C-alpha cells in the first residue's frame, strides 16, 4: 500500500502546446513518455464505485483507494493495488456482483522523477489536465505530507499554473456527474 498526494488542474487549450517544454525543462533529465490509460470503475448497482481496473499498455492493475476528504483541492489517498492478467478479470468481479459503472480514457504525456509523476493528459469527456502526484510510504507522517504539499505547490508555480484553481473532484465523480 502507498499514500499518494495528488493535485490536478484543468488546462486551457492555449497552454497545451507550451506546457510539455516547461515541464521537461523544470524536471531536467526526466524523459517524456506517452501515456494511454483505460479505466473501468466497478461497484454495486446504485452505489459508488469501489475499485477500478486500469489497462495501461499491456499492464492491468486493480486499485482500491481509501480517500481522505480535503478542502484544499489536493487528493490524499491510500492505495491498495495489485497486478492481474487481463483474461478473466471482468468475469471474476461481475461474478461477485460488481458491475462496470464508469469508464475513463486518458491520453497524453508523462514524466517521472523519483517518487514524482507528472502527467499532461486529455480525459475523454472532460478535457485537458495537468496532474502531479507524489508517492509516499503508507505510514508517512504529517511532516512528510506537508513537504509533499509544498513540493506540489512549488511545481505548480514553476510550471506556470499556480494561478489556476485545483480540481478537487475525482475524475470518476466528474464523469458520473456529466452522465446524469
Predicted feature locations:
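Mixed-charge, glycine-accented linear interaction segment located at domain edges/termini
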Residues: 141-169
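N-terminal strand-loop-strand beta-hairpin
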Residues: 1-115, 159-180
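Conserved, surface-exposed functional patches that form binding/active-site neighborhoods
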Residues: 96-142
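A short, polar/proline- and glycine-enriched secondary-structure boundary/capping micro-motif
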Residues: 72-78, 131, 142-145
Amino acid at each position: 500500500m502507498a499514500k499518494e498526494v495528488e493535485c490536478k488542474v484543468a488546462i486551457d487549450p492555449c497552454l497545451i502546446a507550451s506546457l510539455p517544454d516547461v515541464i521537461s525543462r523544470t524536471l531536467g533529465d526526466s524523459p517524456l513518455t506517452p501515456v494511454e490509460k483505460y479505466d473501468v470503475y466497478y461497484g454495486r448497482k446504485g452505489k459508488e464505485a469501489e475499485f477500478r481496473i486500469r489497462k495501461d499498455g499491456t499492464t492491468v492493475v486493480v486499485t482500491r483507494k481509501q480517500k481522505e476528504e480535503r478542502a484544499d483541492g489536493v487528493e490524499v489517498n491510500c492505495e491498495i493495488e495489485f497486478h492481474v492478467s487481463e483474461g478473466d478479470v471482468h468475469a471474476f468481479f461481475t461474478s461477485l456482483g460488481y458491475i462496470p459503472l464508469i469508464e475513463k480514457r486518458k491520453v497524453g504525456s508523462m514524466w517521472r522523477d523519483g517518487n514524482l509523476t507528472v502527467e499532461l493528459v486529455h480525459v475523454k469527456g472532460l478535457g485537458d489536465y495537468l496532474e502531479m502526484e507524489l508517492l509516499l510510504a503508507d505510514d508517512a507522517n504529517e511532516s512528510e505530507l506537508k513537504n509533499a504539499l509544498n513540493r506540489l505547490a512549488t511545481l505548480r508555480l514553476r510550471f506556470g499554473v499556480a494561478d489556476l484553481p485545483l480540481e478537487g473532484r475525482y475524475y470518476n465523480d466528474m464523469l458520473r456527474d456529466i452522465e446524469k
